[in-house]
Amino acid sequence: MRVRADVVLIENGQVVLIERHRAEKHYYVFPGGGVDEGETPEQAAIREMEEETGLRVTIKRELAEIHFDLSVQHYFLVEKIGGEFGSGTGEEFTEADPDNPAQGIYIPTWMALAELPEHDNVYPAEVAKLAANSISAGWPKEPVLVVERMK
């Protein structure tokens, strides 16, 4: 089973996303990636955030757990404690090949929470909805569990 750890960082009414252009598709995802052997999902989330955005964060709490076929994705609400946005050093940047459409490009970006409902290309939609609703409703008391199956 593949385990991923992803982060939700909100500051000044904006959320950090990774803008992706891949194989002629344009979409946004939350920063994150695979959990390495011997690593907890929390440790992976912190590492991935720094690799992909250049920001150092601390975990506040788990927001969601998404089960999708043979993978589990953990989404954590985080708080920034340092770093420089856009200075990520992950292989997405150091080994990027803009001429390879299968690999695509990664662009760390900020998006206003109020704009999230206008975009149908922010994934996963369940986490985007949680972030957008946090403005008025706050965060759920317990992590949201989502189970999806391939159709």
Q: What is each stretch, according to the model?
A:
Residues 1-16, 37:
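Conserved N-terminal beta-strand and adjoining loop/helix that marks the start
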Residues 9-12, 20, 78-80:
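Active-site beta-strand termini and strand-to-loop segments that position acidic
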Residues 14-19, 85-87:
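Short, well-ordered strand-loop elements centered on a beta-strand within folded domains, enriched
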Residues 23-26:
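A conserved beta-turn-beta hairpin within the catalytic core of GNAT-like acetyltransferases
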Residues 29-30:
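A short gly/proline-enriched turn/hairpin at secondary-structure junctions
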Residues 35-58, 67-123, 149-151:
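Unchanged
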Residues 122-151:
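Charged phosphate-binding loop/patch that engages nucleotide di/tri-phosphates or the phosphate backbone
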